[in-house]
Amino acid sequence: MRYRLVIFDWDGTLMDSVARIVDCMQAASRDAGWGELEAERVRNIIGLGLPEAIASLCPGIDSVRAELLRSRYAWHFVEGNDTPMRFFAGVEEGLAGLHDRGGQRLAVATGKSRRGLDRIFRESDSGRWFHASRTADETRSKPHPRMLEELLVELGVAPQEAVMVGDTEYDLEMARAIGMDRVAVTWGVHAPERLAASRPAFTAEAVPELFNWLQGR
């Protein structure tokens, strides 16, 4: 088995949550008095930690308004928005297959908060598939590789024994920074040509392609 550890991004890679993130960020921006944010700009920052995302979307924003925007985003995401979020078709079966074959550990590295990821784990009963996880509010945000470095130390795996799977250049670049293989998926937020610049070992254009490739490794 080539990879002892497979690390997945969450939003846009495993879960179809992009529309909800965009809606909630746009609503939060209006609530905070910053005005309307273009959907494509919001899509572009998905994967970053929330403070980093706000700083990118709202250059020059003061700390008080940034905190208001952050709190309104959290409210909209948890309580104020009912845009459906579900796993992409085939993801649950693919994760279960990797988990059940044994000998390989699974982890999550996400721009979500710990509270948000744990809530999704509970609601979807998906936490049982993963041996470890890191969120952007408990370590450095992507594209800094610290969350990957911490996962490797926790699970006792070398970078050359692991692979990162994601839909953004932030995912791929943090893996590239520490010499870790990376797999790009094209059903998320960043365009294939943008992902290709990070030189992924494989690019999956459909969920079955991703898990078939991982099963062979």
State where each predicted segment sits.
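Glycine-rich phosphate-binding loop signature in dinucleotide/nucleotide-binding domains
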Residues: 1, 100-104, 155-161, 217
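Active-site neighborhood of HAD-like aspartate-dependent phosphohydrolases
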Residues: 1-44, 60
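Short, acidic loop-to-helix structural element flanking the phosphoryl-transfer center
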Residues: 2, 79-108, 114-121, 145
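A metal-dependent, Asp-based hydrolase signature
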Residues: 46-79, 89, 96-97, 105
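Substrate-recognition "cap/lid" segment bordering the active-site pocket of phosphatases
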Residues: 83-86, 113-164, 169-178, 192-194
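Structural motif
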Residues: 101, 178-180, 198
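Short, glycine/polar-rich helix-capping loops at beta-to-alpha or helix-loop-helix junctions
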Residues: 187-197
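Short acidic-hydrophobic, aromatic-tinged amphipathic segments that line or gate anion-handling sites
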Residues: 202-206
